[in-house]
Amino acid sequence: MKNENSKGKAFLLLSMIAFFIMSATFLVMPLIQTNIDSGSNAYNIIIGIIFWLTLIFGMISLFLARKNINGIKEIKRGIGLIKFFQNKIAAIFDILLIISIIGLIILTIATDGTLYICYIFFSAVTFTFIMHCILNGKMFNCLIINKKRSEA
């Protein structure tokens, strides 16, 4: 049981890293705008490939994490889309998600949305939303429950 859960934890961590890299691609997009003006699309294509590969890798890692976690079928919850503050780590990302959404809305209304800080907030909203869904969801909850069972 412990070996399978450690595989599940590893895949879950890999998915989080992949989603972080995917979100970080938004930070590079405005920086490569100058290459579009000069007629070179190579960097845009590379960033697009990185975005899609990390998104796909993150989803596959989540699937493999779910497959390798014991006791997940006993938990009746699904993804953490509409659940908030299910544990301490999730609460941190939920607060960051709310702050990021508010900041993005304010910046979009106050500016024309082309400032670099808008991209930073969009990247933050993307990553914190994904983390919200993962950390409030069934897999992470199952890992916490199994950890508490093994410690007791």
Predicted regions and their residues:
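N-terminal first transmembrane alpha-helix
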Residues: 1-65
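Cytosolic juxtamembrane N-terminal segments of multi-pass membrane proteins
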Residues: 1-9, 78-83, 142-149
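Select subsegments of transmembrane alpha-helices in polytopic membrane proteins
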Residues: 12-19, 89-97
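Hydrophobic membrane-targeting alpha-helices
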Residues: 23, 27-30, 78-81, 105-108, ...
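Juxtamembrane/interface segments of multi-pass membrane proteins
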Residues: 36-40, 82, 115
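Cytosolic juxtamembrane helix at the C-terminal end of the final transmembrane segment
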Residues: 62-76, 126-152
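Loop-to-transmembrane helix junctions at the membrane interface
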Residues: 64-95
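Alpha-helical transmembrane segments and their membrane-interface junctions
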Residues: 95-124
